[in-house]
């Protein structure tokens, strides 16, 4: 009958690639049972991510240990950016608490579980695991990198959501004043955030002839057309000699408007095909869509004058009238909730009372009476 398997030797050997890794060499009286169990003892303070969006210290948090052990391995700056979650199951030597036993080769969770008296020396736990959360950036350089999309790899979601929230508004206001044609600035404007529209309204009031102001007008109409009208008014008021402003701010008398109709339908500065809509107020833009332009060519082969009268024949009626520009759209107006007035409620109450009065009268039972014979002499 063979002798029992006994443990004769325990030796701790350091790892080679990582100083945190160690080997526990177990020597038995039968060499075939010898094992080298690899484990780790964490000693680093993390200031980097072990993988994108997470930090996983080599520490096994066993029952009875405070979670503060996990947070002690990350720098204070990261402590504000990451949250601790339930990590993967792990095993740790009780006589070296926090050590992380690697599962590899023959050493598996099942192998440890099947070892006799293993629970006397090995405890189960969960590995420390941190994941990144949304947080407010504390320094201007980080805000600049995230909001200008220079480097968004480590940006929290609230600073990397295509400008859907207000977190980048302050930075983009200053950034876009210096570079209004920047694609990121135009993307911020397309999100239709009011700080963006207000910023571009101020910029275009000085530089309405810039190309990005055409995009600005296209974006804000029809719902926020006042931002564009304000910019056009200020620009044209400061540049009255600019021919582009002659439709919005015509320097001559209004006699043409009186006899020929709205100048957006006949004035060259308004009707030319090359005209950009940004040079029209919103109401002029709407008006121009209602103008009908009729163009024709008249060829006169002969002209006969009789008593200062001339008769010309043209084929203008054969052409189809072309409607002007596409309508810029109607702004969304929220209807106010109409509450019933006291007068209406009082009238309704009186009518209901009268109806109930007549119903009560006609619903009463008829009183039985005796017939009385009256004789007249």
From Swiss-Prot:
The chain crosses the membrane at residues 342-362. It is a single-pass type II membrane protein. Coiled coil: none annotated. Most cysteines are linked by disulfide bonds. They are created by the viral disulfide bond formation pathway, a poxvirus-specific redox pathway that operates on the cytoplasmic side of the MV membranes. It is found in: Virion membrane. A lipid is attached at residue 2 (N-myristoyl glycine). Residues 2-341 are virion surface. Keywords: Disulfide bond, Fusion of virus membrane with host membrane, Late protein, Lipoprotein, Membrane, Myristate, Signal-anchor, Transmembrane, Transmembrane helix, Viral envelope protein, Viral penetration into host cytoplasm, Virion, Virus entry into host cell. The keyword Signal does not apply. The keyword RNA-binding does not apply. GO terms for cellular component: membrane; viral envelope; virion membrane. It holds the Pfam family Pox_G9-A16. GO terms for biological process: membrane fusion involved in viral entry into host cell; symbiont entry into host cell. Induction: Expressed in the late phase of the viral replicative cycle. Envelope protein part of the entry-fusion complex responsible for the virus membrane fusion with host cell membrane during virus entry. Also plays a role in cell-cell fusion (syncytium formation). This is Virion membrane protein A16. It comes from Vaccinia virus (strain Ankara) (VACV).
